[in-house]
Every structure is written in structure tokens, then in C-alpha cells.
Amino acid sequence: MRSVRIAILVCLSASGVAAMAVVQRGAGTTRPPSANAPAEATSRIVAAAVALTAMLDESGRAKLQFPFAGPQRTKWSNLPSGIFRREGLRLGDLSAAQRSAVMNLLAAALSPAGYRKVVDIMRGDEVLRRNQSTGGGRNAAPNAGRGRGGPAGPGGGVTFGDDEYYLAFLGTPSVTVPWMLQFGGHHLAINLTLAGSQAAMVPSLPAAQPATYTFEGRTVRPLGNENDKAFALINALDDTQRHQAILGYRVADLVLGPGQDGRTIQPEGIRASALSPSQQTMMWSIAEEWAGIMNTVFAEPRMAEIRSNLRDTYFAWSGPTTNGSPAYFRIQGPTLLIEYAPQQDSVDHIHTIYRDPTNDYGAKFVGK
């Protein structure tokens, strides 16, 4: 039996955001991950982090590094620069080689699909910047400041673009000692906590504006799978199931977005155990769009944990059920919270949140 090996190649695109090609070598069935795979994945992430750090001068390292247990871990937001002040290493201040090293680190930390999602979100913000500089267009951003999220910056206008994303290390990258990789900007917050062979990428916020745009002749929808899979599920329910799933009130925004750590929502909607096996599969596929952003080695056991709570997992819906309409949905279980919330009835401006109420910031394995 021949194995399939995947190589991730990262290069800078014309816009300055790294592009990724996934090259398949060999053919046949992929072998299951070894028992050492999580530790090996952590080692690759740490190696990429160390390689980046070695490229920085003293000032750059000072911007990058924060205490592990300090206040920086909760300083993340969906808001753009000029409204929310981020700290860390700003992509726009880096050389091309340093920027490529940041994107190589993200490629190591994320799955191929997760990496593409992050790049597509960043490119979407570059679309906003270009439209801002030319006076707008279909993808202009009149409501970009909407949403909760931390301290404002000191005056100035709102700034979009793929330069406005920041990287921070909380603690020192290590294969044994807990540390955290934080990466974010407008409509993106990745909080990845690593402790040896354990990893948690919660809370995280992948969002999109514009939700659809054109890049190099192709249509890009950063959250298109999430949207389409959810509408497919709600329309696969029978009348009785829909009555249970659809909330009797409108949800206009994320309930547990930025700044809402430690809070909970009363479960609502239809229990996953009331779904047919095929409908359950559809729901898990939706959840995997968020859980599967991080490196696959860590995402697979995370999805197994989520599935194990079938009887206590709920799917809730608020809004129209025709695809192309602005509708909120939520998947919630003992170790899972996913929310998807179009902003101000716009299908072109989407916020989402992904949490584990038992393990945000890796609480289970770092003891904080």
C-alpha cells in the first residue's frame, strides 16, 4: 500500500498575502496518523515559530512576545484597525521574507482548508481597502465598525487591508511548556494554545466582509461552505423538526462574541438526537468547518469529542430558510459553541464565533 504525502508550498502573492498550493505525491490510501503525530505537529509549529523569531531584530521580538498568563490572551476582536488597537507583530511592518515566515507558521498551525480560509478572509479585507481608496463599489464597508470587541485605537480613520493583521506569542514557543499563538485582524481572530501534544483553537472568530468577491478571476467565498451546509440542513428537516429548530425570535448578532468569555447560552433548538443519521452527518460537517481550521492532527480528536456529545448537542436557527437570505444559526453542545450571524440583514457581512465553554484558551490542559 502506498501512502499519500502532502507538501504545503507557501509563496507571496501580488497582494502580499501568502498563497498556498497543496501538492500530492504518490497514490493510494493515506495511513492513519501515528501515536506521535500530535507531538510531531507541535514540533513543526514550534520550528516555524523559532525560524520566524530568528529573523527579527530586538524590537520585532519585543513586539511579538507577551507573558503567557497576561491580559493579551483576551485582546482579540472582529473590529478593524482604527477602532480596535491590536498589539503584536504587524504584517505591514515586515519584510517580504519575514512575512512569508509568518504565513509558513500559519500553514504549519492550520489545516490546508483552514489556511485557505484565513488567506481568503485576509484577501477580502484587502478588497475592502482597495474599494475604500477608490470610493466604494459593491464591496464597500459602510458597517465595518459594527460589533463588540475591546479597546479602541487612538483616533484616526478605520484602516482595512492585509497589512493590518498581527501575530503574537504568549509564552515562549515550546514542545513541552504551554504557549499560545495569537493571530488576527479585521474579521479574524485565531487563538491557538499548545501544550506538548495537546492543542485548542478556541475561542476563534473567522468572519467575512465581503462574503463574496473575485480574486484573479475566481469567485471567493471565505465562509461559503458554512453558509451552504447550514441552509442545506435546515431545508432537510421536516415540518416537525423545523418547528423545534427555528427560534421564535430574531438573533441579530453573535451572543458570545468578543468580550463575552465565561458566559453561557441556554441551549435551544432541535436536539441532534432528534435528527436522522444523514441529518446528523450534515450537522457534524458544519461543525467541522470551524473545528477543522486547526492542524488536522488536532482537529480529528476534537471532532470526535464533539460527536460524542450527540444527545446534548442542539441546532438552532433564526431567520429565513432560503439560501441567499440573512439567517443566524447556532450549534451548541457541552464542549462546543458555534454561532453564525449576518450583520444588519446583509449576506455580504458575516460574523462567526467558535468556542469550547470547557476549554477556551486551553483551560483543560494549562490549568487557567
Outline where the language-model segments fall.
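A cross-kingdom marker for long, charged
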Residues: 22-107, 111-368
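Positively charged n-region of N-terminal signal peptides that target proteins for export
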Residues: 1-6
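Bacterial N-terminal signal peptides
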Residues: 7-18
